[in-house]
Regions:
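Short, acidic, metal-binding catalytic loop of nucleotide-sugar glycosyltransferases
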Residues: 14-23
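Short acidic/polar active-site loop segments enriched in Thr and Asp
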Residues: 22-23, 82, 122
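Active-site beta-to-alpha loop of glycosyltransferases that engages the nucleotide-sugar donor
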Residues: 1-14, 31
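Short beta-strand/loop segment that forms part of the nucleotide-sugar
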Residues: 22-32, 54-57
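Boundary detector for helix-to-coil junctions that initiate low-complexity/charged tails
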Residues: 271-327
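Acidic metal-phosphate-binding loop of nucleotide-sugar-dependent transferases
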Residues: 89-93
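Active-site-proximal specificity loops/subdomain of glycosyltransferases
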Residues: 37-86
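Catalytic-site signature of metal-activated, phosphate-bearing donor transferases
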Residues: 65-66, 95-287
Length: 327
C-alpha cells in the first residue's frame, strides 16, 4: 500500500513489472493526492497492473494487514498465484544465490522452487537497507524479517508484514529471498514521508509532542524518531565508513532497464565534506534551539491560560453569590 510515493513509485513499478510481469502486480493506493503519482498509477493500470483505489482512509492504512490478508484469500479462491509477496513501495525483490545477489527472475524462481505449496509462513533472509548518501552501499539486517506466502497458506498479517499466521500449519521457513529497502530518502523527502506516515495518529508535530509519542513505542513510533533527527546527524551516520557492504546488483539492473534513480539519493554538495558537515551542525543546533524556545513559549502560554482561567473563576464567585442572594 502506498500514498504519494513521488520518487519511489515509478522505479518500484518499472522494476517489478520487468521482473514479474505487470499482470502479476496489485498496487493498493491509500488516497494519493499527487498528480504525478496518480498519473503513474493510471499508466501502471493501462499497462496491465491492477490498481486498487478504494482503500483511501487513514483507518484502512492502519488495518492494511488484515485487509491484504483477506485480499490474498479471495485470490486463492478465484485466481490463485504460486506465491504472494507483500511489498512496500520502498522494497525491491531479489534473491541470494551461491554466486551472490541476483535480480533475475530465473534465479528467484529457482530459489522459490522448494517452497511451492509450502504450509509454512515464509520469511525473507535479509533486508539490504540502502545508504542515501553513498550509492551501492547497504546495511544488511536479519531483524524483523518480512513474511510471504505460498498458495493457500495465508491466514493473517500484521500491519508491517513482519508477523503472520498460516492457515495450513504453524511453522516458519527462512528462504533465500531478499529485499532491497529504500527506507532512507534524501533528508527533506524523508521528513515528508515520515510525517505522512505519522499523520494518522499524531496531529501535534512539535518536538515535545514527537518525543512523548516516541517514548510510547506506539504505532509508527520510528517515524517520530525520524522527525526528531536533524540533517547533520542524518547525513553523518551515512558517511560513516563502518557497517556498509557493497551490493551493485540492483542499480545495475536499474541501469539495464533504464530506471532513473538519482532522486533516491541525497544531492551531492559542492562544498568539501568537512565544511558541509560543519555548516549542517550549526544549522541543526540553531533549529533545535528554536524548537526548545517554541516549546518554552507553548508551556508558558498554557500556564498563563490556566492562571487566568483560575483568577476569572475566583472573581466570578462573589458575583454569583450576590446574584443568588439578590434573587
Amino acid at each position: 500500500m502506498q500514498k504519494d510515493e513521488t520518487i519511489l513509485l515509478d522505479p518500484w513499478y518499472s522494476y517489478h513489472a520487468n521482473l514479474l510481469g505487470p499482470e502479476n502486480l496489485f498496487i493498493f493506493d491509500n488516497g494519493s493526492k499527487s498528480t504525478s503519482v496518480i498519473q503513474s498509477l493510471q499508466r501502471a493500470g493501462s499497462n496491465g497492473a491492477t490498481v486498487i483505489w478504494e482503500y483511501s482512509t487513514r483507518h484502512e492504512y492502519r488495518e492494511r494487514g488484515s485487509m491484504i490478508a483477506n485480499f490474498i484469500q479471495r485470490l486463492d479462491h478465484s485466481n490463485p498465484f504460486d506465491f504472494y509477496f507483500l511489498l512496500d513501495c520502498d522494497e525491491f525483490l531479489a534473491c541470494q544465490t551461491n554466486s551472490g545477489i541476483s535480480c533475475q527472475r530465473r534465479d528467484i524462481e529457482r530459489v522459490l522452487q522448494p517452497c511451492i505449496g509450502s504450509r509454512d509462513v515464509l520469511l525473507i533472509r535479509h533486508k539490504f537497507w540502502h545508504n542515501p548518501c553513498r550509492m551501492h552501499l547497504y546495511s544488511i539486517t536479519n531483524s524483523s524479517p518480512k513474511c510471504f506466502f505460498a498458495q493457500g497458506a495465508c491466514d493473517s498479517l500484521d500491519h508491517g508484514y513482519h508477523h503472520a499466521k498460516s492457515r495450513l500449519g504453524s511453522g516458519e521457513t527462512i528462504t533465500n529471498i531478499i529485499y532491497f529497502e529504500f527506507h532512507y530518502k534524501p533528508y527533506r523527502l524523508h521528513r515528508i514521508s515520515s510525517r505522512q506516515h505519522l499523520s494518522c495518529v499524531v496531529t501535534d508535530f512539535s518536538r515535545r509532542s514527537l518525543q512523548a509519542y516516541q517514548k510510547k513505542q506506539d504505532f509508527n513510533h520510528h517515524c517520530a524518531e525520524d522527525l526528531l533527527e536533524g540533517k547533520f546527524d542524518y547525513v553523518r551516520r551515512f558517511l560513516d565508513p563502518q557497517g556498509w557492504e557493497r551490493a551493485p546488483a540492483l542499480l545495475a539492473e536499474f541501469n539495464r532497464i533504464g530506471i532513473s534513480y538519482a532522486s533516491l539519493y541525497e544531492p551531492k554538495s559542492l562544498l568539501p565534506q568537512p565544511l558541509q558537515l560543519s555548516l549542517l551542525r550549526i544549522r541543526q543546533s540553531v533549529m533545535h534551539r528554536v524548537d526548545e524556545l517554541n516549546d518554552l513559549l507553548y508551556r508558558g502560554a498554557r500556564l498563563i491560560f490556566r492562571k487566568t482561567s483560575w483568577l476569572m473563576q475566583r472573581s466570578l464567585q462573589p458575583l454569583l453569590r450576590m446574584t443568588r442572594f439578590g434573587g
